[in-house]
């Protein structure tokens, strides 16, 4: 069976790819440039991870209209990328308005054309930045949209294997599957060394700390987030 994996190059999408690969599926991987600050580094990670898993069917999509729309510190250089707030409950400035719906729409189109029946995305609800399009209820609803908006015989289903996991559990799952964490990139701000202080870096570093393993990528600073 064929499956499309939405592969940003980050830790969550890496582990999701490892899970799908472990299922013995024929994988096709899609990466989206949406005008984000670190798109070149993320693309490098995408290609490295796809190569590691021998994924030959790749689609690199330009969706930089999301950058033109703006409204997010990931795409709008007039907005500062906020520092980590691991206890915060407000939706952070890094939220890209309705981004995942755009990604899923493009991925479903491709899946329908290439005959894929599964669509994997590394969304995390439990231990994440609180993005509204990373909730299980959102993906349940989108599966209904796919059912209503594609040919009856298509049968595409979105799978979110990490949705209820904590970040530390995601690291442990990746280690269990021997995922190449050194290829992944999570930083919102930097393409050289990861900054270590944005929300994404902080959640990643804390997860590795909780597991008791050193994160293999380079950081400009490497704060301790467990006190």
Curated annotation (Swiss-Prot):
Keyword field: ATP-binding, Ligase, Metal-binding, Nucleotide-binding, Queuosine biosynthesis, Zinc
Keyword Acetylation: no
Cofactor mode of binding and number, as noted: Binds 1 zinc ion per subunit.
Cofactor(s) it depends on: Zn(2+)
Any one GO molecular function term: zinc ion binding
Gene Ontology biological process terms, A to Z: queuosine biosynthetic process
InterPro entries per UniProt: QueC, Rossmann-like_a/b/a_fold
Pathway, per record: Purine metabolism; 7-cyano-7-deazaguanine biosynthesis
UniProt KW ATP-binding keyword: yes
Catalytic activity from the UniProt record: 7-carboxy-7-deazaguanine + NH4(+) + ATP = 7-cyano-7-deazaguanine + ADP + phosphate + H2O + H(+)
EC primary class: ligase
Binding site for Zn(2+): 187, 195, 198, 201
UniProt-annotated binding residues for ATP: 7-17
Record EC number: 6.3.4.20
Role, per record: Catalyzes the ATP-dependent conversion of 7-carboxy-7-deazaguanine (CDG) to 7-cyano-7-deazaguanine (preQ(0)).
Family classification: Belongs to the QueC family.
Protein name: 7-cyano-7-deazaguanine synthase
Species of the source: Chlorobium phaeovibrioides (strain DSM 265 / 1930)
């Amino acid at each position: 069976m064929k499956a499309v994996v939405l592969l940003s190059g980050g830790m969550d999408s890496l582990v999701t790819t490892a899970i799908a690969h472990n299922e013995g599926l024929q994988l096709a991987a899609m990466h989206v440039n949406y005008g984000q600050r670190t798109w070149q580094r993320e693309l490098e990670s995408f290609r490295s991870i796809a190569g590691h898993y021998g994924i030959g069917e790749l689609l690199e999509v330009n969706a930089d209209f999301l950058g033109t729309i703006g409204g997010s510190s990931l795409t709008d250089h007039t907005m500062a990328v906020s520092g980590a707030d691991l206890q915060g409950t407000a939706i952070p400035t890094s939220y890209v308005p309705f981004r995942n719906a755009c990604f899923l729409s493009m991925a479903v189109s491709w899946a329908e054309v290439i005959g894929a029946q599964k669509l994997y995305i590394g969304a995390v609800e439990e231990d994440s930045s609180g993005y509204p399009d990373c909730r299980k209820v959102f993906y349940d609803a989108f599966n209904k949209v796919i059912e209503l908006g594609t040919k009856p015989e298509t049968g595409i289903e979105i799978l979110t294997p990490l949705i209820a996991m904590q970040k530390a559990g995601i690291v442990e799952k990746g280690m269990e599957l021997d995922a190449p964490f050194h290829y992944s990139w999570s930083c919102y701000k930097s393409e050289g060394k990861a900054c270590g202080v944005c929300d994404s870096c902080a959640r990643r570093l804390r997860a590795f700390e909780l597991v008791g393993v050193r994160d293999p990528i380079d950081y400009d600073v490497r704060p301790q987030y467990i006190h």
